[in-house]
Amino acid sequence: MQQPIVGVGHSMGGCQIATLSVTSRRIFSTMILLDPAIGPPEMGLATLGLGQLTLRRRTQWLTREDAEKALRTSFSTWDPQVLDLLIKHSIHSDKQSVEMEDGPVSLVTGRYQELVNYIKPSFIRSGKVVGQELVHQTGPVDMYHMLGLVTCSTLYLCGGESTLSTPRARESYGLAE
């Protein structure tokens, strides 16, 4: 691939971009990680919490207006321009004809498609369970332990009110208050 390539990822996408940068060291010249789901075990990112949240999250609305209202409420602390972009690119019409402006809409990424990013089976081909739980996710914790292997310049950005930017989280990264 021709450089420069800048990897940009938010939340679990940030974790995946960072992991790719470690496994394919020359792919990115720079990374921008926005509230990346990367952290030590005590932050709880290796548990089923992300998967459970995904399964409870609403993904369909009767109208685009309903979806926009719900997203603006859920992400009310976001910068308005960023929120406008999220709404523009994350909702699509459920109708066959794109000419119809109103009607049912869904998130572009469905809940089960998102879920497979957060959990993986812990049983082997024989069906025998390897761990205590049937599914688990270690990607965010694995990447936390691999942060020292990142070789490209990286902007690691967490919002002031992000759960990934609490005093406890900053302490786990060795960052001063």
From Swiss-Prot:
Swiss-Prot/TrEMBL keywords: Hydrolase, Peroxisome, Virulence
Phenotype of null mutants: Abolishes the production of ACT-toxin and impairs the formation of lesions on leaves sprayed with conidia. Does not affect growth rate of cultures, sporulation, and spore germination.
GO molecular function, one term: hydrolase activity
Subcellular localization(s) per the UniProt record: Peroxisome
Metabolic or biological pathway: Mycotoxin biosynthesis
Enzyme Commission no: 3.1.1.-
Induction: Expression is positively regulated by CSN5 during infection.
Subcellular location, principal: other
Stored SUPFAM superfamilies: alpha/beta-Hydrolases (SSF53474)
Enzyme type, top EC level: hydrolase
Gene Ontology cellular-component terms listed: peroxisome
Note: Gene clusters encoding host-selective toxins (HSTs) are localized on conditionally dispensable chromosomes (CDCs), also called supernumerary chromosomes, where they are present in multiple copies. The CDCs are not essential for saprophytic growth but controls host-selective pathogenicity. Although conventional disruption of ACTT2 could not be accomplished due to the high number of the copies identified in the genome, the high sequence identity among these copies of ACTT2 is likely an advantage for RNA silencing, because it allows knockdown of all copies of this gene simultaneously.
Purpose: Abhydrolase domain-containing protein; part of the gene clusters that mediate the biosynthesis of the host-selective toxins (HSTs) ACT-toxins responsible for brown spot of tangerine disease by the tangerine pathotype which affects tangerines and mandarins. ACT-toxins consist of three moieties, 9,10-epoxy-8-hydroxy-9-methyl-decatrienoic acid (EDA), valine and a polyketide. ACT-toxin I is toxic to both citrus and pear; toxin II the 5''-deoxy derivative of ACT-toxin I, is highly toxic to pear and slightly toxic to citrus.
Family that this chain belongs to: Belongs to the AB hydrolase superfamily. AKT2 hydrolase family.
Protein name stated in the entry: Abhydrolase domain-containing protein ACTT2-3
